[in-house]
Design a protein with these regions (language model features):
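N-terminal nucleophile
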Residues: 1, 39, 43-60
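Catalytic alpha/beta active-site cores
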Residues: 1-39, 128-131, 135-140, 157-161
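Function-dense linear segments that define catalytic or interfacial modules
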Residues: 1-2, 111-224
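Alpha/propeptide regions of enzymes that mature by internal proteolysis
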Residues: 11-47, 90-99, 105-109, 117, ...
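Active-site-proximal structural scaffolding
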Residues: 13, 33, 37-40, 102, ...
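Short, well-ordered loop/turn elements at secondary-structure boundaries
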Residues: 43, 53-55, 87-88, 102-107, ...
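Internal maturation/activation junctions in enzymes
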Residues: 52-96, 188-201, 205, 209, ...
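Conserved mixed alpha/beta core segments that line enzyme active sites in large multi-domain catalysts
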Residues: 95, 99-106, 111, 118, ...
Length: 253
């Protein structure tokens, strides 16, 4: 009766096995389609639950020309393919497509009424990674499910969330950012992924990412309105995160 306090039992896993067997049998003699692979990944995410609470998030990056994924959330998909709710979907390109692509993509997005697919520019991700000189841009980057963080293949994000309350002062927010940064810095050292391939550990340790995010900004008068004061606050909060990370990185060696 508490959050995360009750086991889900074996049924979600049984459902996954049944779904996988049916999918493979339906594709006998051929390769799985991109949409079948997408659905199978979503189904795996669907069974990652604790106490009936979802504990997974996915993003599916597909070729611009992939019509199957473009239409994955068109019509009343939730009635027959409910697992697709687990993933955000985006078209991923490395070279600027022709105008026709954007036109057809926006038309499909509007007609689906789901707000998807999004668009992810891999070349822009490489340019941003190279911009500050601290990351190796020579990767086919993807992104985390909410698309805040550029990621290598086989890599985790490391995001700590600050909950903003309506009456929070700058001093209160700085304190929250400091604690979130401490948690994130500690979490960045947890790289013993014993059930994953070594490449996951290598990438996570090499980049040692840290992200501190603000949620609830629309409830706060300063944070929800573009202004010079907002810019000042955000810069000061960023400085707190950077300084706290440096302090705790030294402590941790």
């Amino acid at each position: 009766k508490t959050f995360g306090g009750r086991a889900s039992g074996p049924q979600p896993l049984v459902d996954l096995f049944t779904y996988a067997v049916e999918t493979f049998r339906g594709a006998a003699g051929r390769r799985l389609s991109s949409l079948e692979c997408h659905d199978l990944a979503c189904k795996i995410g669907e069974v990652v639950v604790v106490g009936g609470v979802r504990r997974s998030a996915l993003i599916s990056l597909s070729n611009p020309s992939d019509g199957r994924l473009r239409g994955a959330k068109s019509g009343q998909w939730w009635l027959t393919e409910g697992q697709r709710a687990l993933a955000n979907n985006s078209a991923c390109y490395t070279e600027k497509p022709e105008f026709d692509f954007f036109l057809s993509e926006m038309k499909a997005l509007y007609e689906s009424k789901s707000g998807e697919r999004g668009i992810f520019n891999r070349q822009a991700a490489q340019d941003i990674a190279a911009k500050n000189g601290r990351r190796d841009p020579a990767f086919d980057f993807g992104t985390n499910p909410c698309s805040e963080i550029i990621l290598r293949p086989n890599q985790f994000c490391n995001l700590s969330e600050v909950v903003v309350r309506q009456g929070d002062t700058l001093k209160v927010l700085k304190s929250k950012v400091r604690w979130a940064t401490i948690l994130g810095t500690l979490q960045s050292t947890l790289t013993d992924f014993r059930y994953l391939r070594p490449i996951w550990k290598k990438n996570t340790e090499e980049e040692c990412l840290l992200g501190v995010s603000l949620t609830g900004i629309m409830d706060h008068d300063t944070l929800n309105t573009p202004s010079p004061l907002l810019v000042k606050w955000l810069r000061e909060l960023k400085e707190v995160a950077v300084e706290t990370n440096l302090e705790w990185s030294k402590r941790l060696g």
